[in-house]
């Protein structure tokens, strides 16, 4: 029975991922820029951003919310900016600091922007105050559907719950079209605390994990 439920969830995730990615690809370049700017403006007002010292930001790829302006502003404010580096294998993904953008960045694995090899400065995930996360789809309870590799579930699941000294904030940037009624999830899936869209800031229901 449990195996059948898991199989159904996997199938549902695959279908949902396909549908939402198609919707996102249909956005015009102009529409994506305008929506991304609105999301950026809302994000800059968050206490989590203003007070955060070490911030993980994803470097936008294909149809994702554009993060260039956020990266530049965070660096200009003197924050330590950390970005993902796909390494494959059991580690899957590491984090690395960048100090100049876009000068230190180039296309990496799968064409995803990441630091050039000579600028890799590995960072412990446990030092990060704020994780700004990408994703394919989200629900208002904080459910997140990623691209299927499980990189963030692994890196956050292994570090966030063990941090007793301070709470790390998990914030997703997404277009309204990426919101769905329910994301199929398991106990290993990481939920976000807030979702920022071009129209609103969603305070997600607290998950049992945090």
Roles of regions detected by a PLM:
Residues 1-11, 22, 76, 101, ...:
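Surface-exposed, charge/polar-rich loops and edge strands
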Residues 2-127:
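N-terminal active-site beta-alpha-beta segment that forms phosphate/nucleotide-binding
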Residues 20, 57, 81, 132, ...:
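A residue-level signal for conserved active-site and pocket-lining positions in enzyme catalytic cores
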Residues 58-60, 84, 133-134, 172-174:
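Short beta-strand segments
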Residues 61, 137, 201:
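Flexible, active-site-proximal loop/turn residues at the rims of small-molecule/cofactor binding pockets
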Residues 72, 147-153:
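Charged helix-capping and loop-helix junction motifs
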Residues 113, 134-136:
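A structured binding-face within diverse protein domains that lines the active/interaction site
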